[in-house]
Design a protein with these regions (language model features):
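N-terminal export signals and maturation junctions of secreted/periplasmic proteins
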Residues: 1-18
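Divalent metal-dependent phosphate-bond-processing catalytic cores, especially two-metal-ion Mg2+/Mn2+ enzymes
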Residues: 14-41, 49, 59, 91, ...
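Conserved acidic
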Residues: 22, 70, 74, 95
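An active-site-proximal "capping" alpha-helix that borders the catalytic cofactor pocket
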Residues: 30-33, 72-89
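Acidic/histidine metal-binding catalytic segments
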Residues: 39-45, 89-104
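Catalytic glutamate of the conserved HExxH
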Residues: 51, 55
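Post-HEXXH active-site segment of zinc metalloproteases
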Residues: 60-75
């Protein structure tokens, strides 16, 4: 299997529809923050897609942040939507699930007052999302042109590729011919 790139995810019409609705600038910022932590490939994808399940909550033509906070299940919808998208693009099912569960657990908004033990990836996505938040949900309304967003995504893809190559070259385990073909394509 070839690595599904952030650029492939970014250019998909489902991503354009739903990530633009929830805030492309925020999605890219969270993906960049996530790069500096655990599994860079999974973390950047989960960071980029973490709000793909957002629904807009309006009352009398105005965004109602309190209504959103009270009724939100975007993490549930987003986990399902991201999983379906990643599988369609050819992501390995195990990684698609890991990314989707990190999206599911990136917020406590749908949980009923219970503590969860999160994996390192799940914690990172929660923390980096919170790091980019602005009062009243303003982080969802920053704008960026398609071209600038695409440049930022391509740059992040290059960073991920370099990190994966570094990890591969420092790994002491021999790599099979099939694994080499999978990572190179």
């Amino acid at each position: 299997m070839c690595r599904v790139t952030l650029e492939q995810i970014f250019q998909h019409h489902i991503t354009q529809k739903y990530v633009n609705r929830s805030g492309m600038v925020h999605a890219i910022a969270v993906a960049y923050h996530a790069f500096h932590h655990t599994s860079v490939d999974a973390a950047t994808k989960a960071g980029f897609l973490h709000d793909i399940g957002h629904h807009t909550w309006y009352r009398n033509g105005e965004w109602d942040y309190e209504l959103y906070k009270k009724n939100d299940i975007h993490a549930i919808k987003g986990a399902e939507r991201a999983h379906k998208l990643l599988i369609r693009l050819g992501e390995h099912p195990k990684q698609a699930k890991e990314i989707s569960v990190a999206i599911l657990l990136h917020t406590d908004s749908f949980l009923l007052e219970q503590a969860l033990e999160r994996t390192p990836l799940q914690n990172i996505i929660k923390w980096v999302d919170e790091a980019d938040e602005e009062p009243g949900g303003a982080h969802h309304y920053r704008t960026i042109s398609y071209e600038k967003a695409l440049q930022a995504i391509k740059r992040l893809d290059e960073m991920v590729d370099r990190e994966l190559q570094t990890q591969q070259s420092t790994s002491s385990a021999p790599i099979s011919t099939n694994e080499k073909a999978e990572k190179i394509c």
